[in-house]
C-alpha cells in the first residue's frame, strides 16, 4: 500500500510523490537559485546566508498563457514557467483556459532556460482575486521565515 502513496499513476512517465510538503516558489527563484537535476533539485539560499532547501515538490501559481495537449505555459509575477502531464491530473482540464489563475503542485523537471514542472495537482483560483494579489508576498514571507 505504501508504494501506491509514493507514485502518481500515469504509466512510464509516472511521478514519484514526495513525502514533504511542496515549497512555494516563484519562477525566478528556480531560474536563478536552483541547483542539481531531476529528482535532486535544491534551492540555494547562500545569498541570505542560509543552507539550501530540497525541492522535492513545489507549489507555484500563475495565469495560464497557453495550453495544449496536456501541457501549459503559465506566468507568475517573476516570469513564465511550463507544466506538463496535465492530462493525468484531476481537475487539470477545467483549469486549462488562457487567462485563468491557477495553482499547480508539481515535481521540478528543469529550471533553465525556464522552470518546467511535472504536474501532480492543479486547481483554479480565478474566483478570488486575493490569491493572485497576495501570491508574491506569501512566497516572500515564507522564505523569510524558513530557518
Swiss-Prot record:
InterPro entries: NA-bd_OB-fold, RMI2. Signal peptide: none annotated. Gene3D superfamilies: Nucleic acid-binding proteins. It is found in: Nucleus. One of its GO terms (cellular component) is RecQ family helicase-topoisomerase III complex. The modification N-acetylalanine is found at residue 2. It is linked to A homozygous deletion of RMI2 has been found in a family with a Bloom-like syndrome and is probable responsible for the phenotype. Patients manifest depigmented skin lesions, multiple cafe-au-lait macules, and growth deficiency. Cells from affected individuals show a high rate of sister chromatid exchange and increased chromosomal breaks. Belongs to the RMI2 family. This is RecQ-mediated genome instability protein 2. It comes from Homo sapiens. The gene is RMI2.
Amino acid at each position: 500500500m505504501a508504494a501506491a502513496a509514493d507514485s502518481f499513476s500515469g504509466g512510464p512517465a509516472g511521478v514519484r510523490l514526495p513525502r514533504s510538503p511542496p515549497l512555494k516558489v516563484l519562477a525566478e527563484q528556480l531560474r536563478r537559485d536552483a541547483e542539481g537535476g531531476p529528482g535532486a533539485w535544491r534551492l540555494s539560499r547562500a545569498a541570505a546566508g542560509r543552507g539550501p532547501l530540497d525541492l522535492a515538490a513545489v507549489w507555484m501559481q500563475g495565469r495560464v498563457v497557453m495550453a495544449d495537449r496536456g501541457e501549459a505555459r503559465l506566468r507568475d509575477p517573476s516570469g513564465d514557467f511550463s507544466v506538463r502531464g496535465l492530462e493525468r491530473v484531476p481537475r487539470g482540464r477545467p483549469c486549462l483556459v488562457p487567462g485563468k489563475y491557477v495553482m499547480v503542485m508539481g515535481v521540478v523537471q528543469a529550471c533553465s532556460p525556464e522552470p518546467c514542472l511535472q504536474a501532480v495537482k492543479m486547481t483554479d483560483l480565478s474566483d478570488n482575486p486575493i490569491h493572485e494579489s497576495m501570491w508574491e508576498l506569501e512566497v516572500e514571507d515564507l522564505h523569510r521565515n524558513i530557518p
